[in-house]
Amino acid sequence: MTAPIQFIDLQAQRRRLGSKLEKSIMDAVQGGQWVMGPQVAELEKQLSEFAGVKHTIACANGTDALLIVLRAWDIGPGDAVFVPTFTFAASAEVVALVGATPVFVDVLEDTYNMDPASLEAAITMIKREGKLKARAVMPVDLFGQTADYRVLEPICKREGLKMLCDAAQGFGALLDGRRAGGIGDAASTSFFPAKPLGCYGDGGATFTNDDALAETLRSIRVHGQGSDKYENVRIGVNSRLDTIQAAILIEKLSVFPEEIELREAVAQRYNNAFRASNRIVEPRVIEGGQSTWAQYTIQVPDRNKLQAELKAKGIPSAVYYPIPLSAQKGYKHFPSAPTPVSDRICNTVISLPMHPYLDTATQDRIIETVLAAV
């Protein structure tokens, strides 16, 4: 019987880390500081070094990592924050949670990241209507690579907008030598288990080079705490990282650079196999970029047929994302630029198994099934 294929094989990674991981977990348990223990500060230090930033603020999850930045910037009612429509709901959700208005922007068809021309059209629309104040842009580093900040950053500077980079899927990626997490006025990531760098529960982090912002973020994540535990200088949230998760992440970070290389090798084998087919659009990494390949996403003319064939052969797949946020029940009342690309690719994208421990025989099985099905 053919062995089942894992979409993301976290157990293979756990076996690789083995006793080192188990010891780190037990050390955290026996240390007795189970929330914000010393491992959290050590993780923040190592993440700052990895991302090339001055400050890392660990928190409870990737959604909070975005939320606390918007709170620190006093973004709220009457403010507009520009987000891509082709992404996970958290990107727009946090904007609505602070009382601001998400304004949806289309993406580029070949990279799935924010389209600068659509962003400019959305900014012009908001200015012309005069009902909202444009405050920030939140590009998402979708599927593992950064948005094209070489174009987006000048737009933000020209318009006086803050940039909060959502690197939940792209943490570890590079753009012209700059690491995702170290780009923008602030950036965030998620340590949800399925992410390229994930823990064994929920976790997140925010990154910045702004000293004052970092101080405010540290306060907000612990109930708006001041210099004393029971001094509350602002309205905050409860978003502390568990010590055990920090211990796990320290061990995972030690192999993360190598895992990025292994993911790249898998992606290149996929690309080389699919490039010859005129019925498959393989993902493109922008010039000067390196992806962490959080997902390997292709486009095909008949997704349902391919999914059925994959399932019949015991190969998992996923659709990220089947509906643009601007068409979702909870978000369709918010303003949006025209989003023809997102509307179209939601019907054609499909993601294949991708992880560092995907062996060549399994890759070949996936490749052969895809090529035969399309």
Regions found by a protein language model. Give the residues of each.
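PLP-dependent aminotransferase class I/II
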Residues: 11, 40-45, 50-54, 106, ...
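N-terminal "arm"/small-domain region of PLP-dependent enzymes with the aminotransferase-like
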Residues: 1-33, 38
